[in-house]
Swiss-Prot record:
Biased composition (Basic and acidic residues): 8-21
Gene this protein is translated from: Ccdc83
Keywords for this protein: Coiled coil
Region (Disordered): 1-25
Name of the protein: Coiled-coil domain-containing protein 83
InterPro entries (alphabetical): CCDC83 (IPR026702)
Coiled coil recorded as keyword: yes
Species of provenance: Mus musculus
Keyword Coiled coil set for record: yes
Highest taxon of source: Eukaryota
Coiled coil: 37-186
């Protein structure tokens, strides 16, 4: 086909007749075109040869591949026959034992798989819990922590305010308490003074002429008891009867209830001073009239001269 094309190309008129003269540039281009066409024809012929050679090589490779597969199959068959000839004889018991081992292994694998599934489920639950906890703490970090911080600051301010108010109230209560104590003490002194005056006025109403000497003696004993020294106390004891602790109580016929009320406190005050100075000289005796001035006996007892 290529040769016929080549012949046709050679037979076909190429360019203008020979007698016509062509320019130099066109003649040069025609020459280069002929060179390229010859080169293309040579390349096409070479490619054709290569294709034929490639086809032959492919046929040979296919045949070699088939022979290789046939030899491999024969070798495998021979190897299997050789292994079967050399393999030991397996009994029924060995097969059953192998099957039991295989079944036991499968059961163990199933149990381990079941346990692994349980562990995976627990791990997934734990992961979900931790994930929810993480989301909660992230939300708390982003939102709740700021709110709680503001709440803590507010509560701290409230606590400080309450403490400050409590301190102020405590100071105010202390001042009020001191004022109340002073007021109560002042009113108590006033009431005591008034009651003393009222008692004196009430006692004066019942005093007669015979009791003025007794009042004067009581005033003298009071002054002496307040200012007397140890020697004066001893001199006062000389005027008392030696059996004072066993003396019988007596009541003067001219004494009234008012004089007894006045005498009793002074007698008790005198005895308290004497007992403080001389605790061992006189033995207390509930029979003695000086110790007998109790709340219920001051109206009926007095010291007899």
């Amino acid at each position: 086909m290529d040769s016929s094309a080549k012949g046709s190309k050679k037979d076909a008129p190429d360019g203008p007749p020979k007698d016509s003269k062509l320019p130099v540039s066109e003649a040069l281009l025609d020459y280069h075109r002929e060179i390229k066409e010859n080169a293309v024809e040579r390349f096409m012929f070479h490619i054709k040869k290569l294709r034929e050679k490639n086809q032959k090589y492919q046929e040979r490779n296919r045949r070699l591949k088939e022979e290789q597969n046939w030899h491999i199959k024969n070798l495998i068959k021979e190897l299997k026959e050789k292994n079967l000839d050399e393999a030991p004889i397996v009994t029924r018991e060995e097969v059953e034992e192998a099957m039991k081992e295989k079944w036991e292994f499968e059961r163990q694998q199933e149990a381990s798989l079941k346990e692994m599934r349980i562990q995976i489920n627990e791990a997934e639950k734990l992961f979900l819990e931790k994930l929810s906890e993480k989301e909660y703490w992230e939300e708390y970090k982003n939102v709740g922590s700021a709110q709680h911080a503001q709440l803590i600051v507010s509560l701290q301010n409230d606590i400080d305010t309450v403490k400050e108010n409590a301190e102020k109230m405590s100071e105010q209560y202390k001042v009020t308490l001191e004022d109340e104590k002073k007021r109560i003490s002042r009113e108590t002194m006033i009431q005591l003074k008034q009651r003393k005056e009222w008692a004196t006025q009430h006692a004066v109403r019942f005093i007669d002429k015979n009791n003025y000497r007794e009042i004067w003696e009581n005033d003298w004993l009071k002054k002496e008891g307040d200012t007397a020294s140890f020697g004066n106390v001893l001199s006062l004891l000389d005027f008392l009867p030696p059996d004072l602790h066993t003396a019988e109580p007596c009541v003067s016929s001219g004494q009234s209830r008012g004089s007894l009320r006045i005498l009793a406190p002074f007698a008790l005050q005198l005895w308290s001073k004497l007992s403080g100075l001389l605790p061992t000289l006189v033995t207390p005796d509930p029979v003695c009239i000086i110790w007998s001035f109790g709340p219920g006996q001051t109206n009926s007892m007095a010291i007899c001269p």
